[in-house]
Every structure is written in structure tokens, then in C-alpha cells.
Amino acid sequence: MWLYIPMIIILIIADQGLKFWISVNIKLGTSQVILPNVLALTNVRNDGAAWSVLSGQQWFFTVITIVALGLMGYFFWKLRSDNLYMLAISLLIAGTLGNFIDRIRLGYVVDMFETLFMNFPIFNVADMCLTFGVIIVIIALIKDEKDE
């Protein structure tokens, strides 16, 4: 269990560090192409959730985040002997805290990864942690279902 705590901390530092770098080095609303026709770093502010849903509802995000972190903390402890769930929950905690830090500190979330080959919302490291965390939870649930 204790191996996952440093992972959470490292992911949060990576998320916050990249967000800081983007904010300092790329002008708001502009992009720097990393891989032509594939990926750009774009400095955008998102005061909503994915696809800017619930834009400007910071109180709502604060309450939901605190409740979610409480639940994740409970499952982090309860499922501490299951490495697959621990990996998933650790990613979910890192992603949740990464974006929560932005919301509390800035009032918005800094997003930066823009896919150039398809129309997809701009996202950040915390969003990737959340996405992979959910995918791993689904895999763990399917695995548990097969084991029964």
C-alpha cells in the first residue's frame, strides 16, 4: 500500500509542474506544435469539467471533490491488498487532487494537451490519471466478475 503514496505524489508534482511550465512559457490561448498533425501544447483555462460542462460551478466541484476523495480514501484503505484496485485508486486520487489544486488555487484548471488528428477536448496529466484510473477499475471489476 505504501508504494502507491509516492506514486500519487509524483503524479501530482508532474501534473502541477507541467501546468506551471505551460502557464509561464505558452501564452494563454496559443499553441506550440510538438508532433505535426498529432499533438500540440495549448494553454487553456477550463472552469468546468470535461468539455467545459458545468462551467463556473466551483462550489459544486469543491463539494463533489471532497466527497469523492473521502470515498477514494475509504477504498484505498479497504482494498489495500489488491494491487490492481490500488493502482486504479491511486491514479484516481492523483488526478482528482491535481485538478482540485488548480480549482482552489486558480479558480480554473489548466489544460494543455491538444490532439490535432481528431476533435477532442484539450486535457492535462490529471485528466489522463483519471481516465486510466477508471479504465483499470473497469478491468478489475471484469476480472472480479470472472473470478466468481
Swiss-Prot record:
GO terms for cellular component: plasma membrane. Pathway: Protein modification; lipoprotein biosynthesis (signal peptide cleavage). It comes from the Bacteria. It is found in: Cell membrane. The keyword Protease applies. Keywords: Aspartyl protease, Cell membrane, Hydrolase, Membrane, Protease, Transmembrane, Transmembrane helix. Pfam families: Peptidase_A8. It catalyses: Release of signal peptides from bacterial membrane prolipoproteins. Hydrolyzes -Xaa-Yaa-Zaa-|-(S,diacylglyceryl)Cys-, in which Xaa is hydrophobic (preferably Leu), and Yaa (Ala or Ser) and Zaa (Gly or Ala) have small, neutral side chains. The keyword Protease applies. One of its GO terms (biological process) is proteolysis. The chain crosses the membrane at residues 2-22, 59-79, 81-101, 122-142. InterPro entries: Peptidase_A8. GO terms for molecular function: aspartic-type endopeptidase activity. It is a multi-pass membrane protein. Its EC number is 3.4.23.36. The active site is at D111, D127. Its main location: membrane. This protein specifically catalyzes the removal of signal peptides from prolipoproteins. PANTHER family: LIPOPROTEIN SIGNAL PEPTIDASE (PTHR33695:SF1). Belongs to the peptidase A8 family. This is Lipoprotein signal peptidase. It comes from Ligilactobacillus salivarius (strain UCC118) (Lactobacillus salivarius).
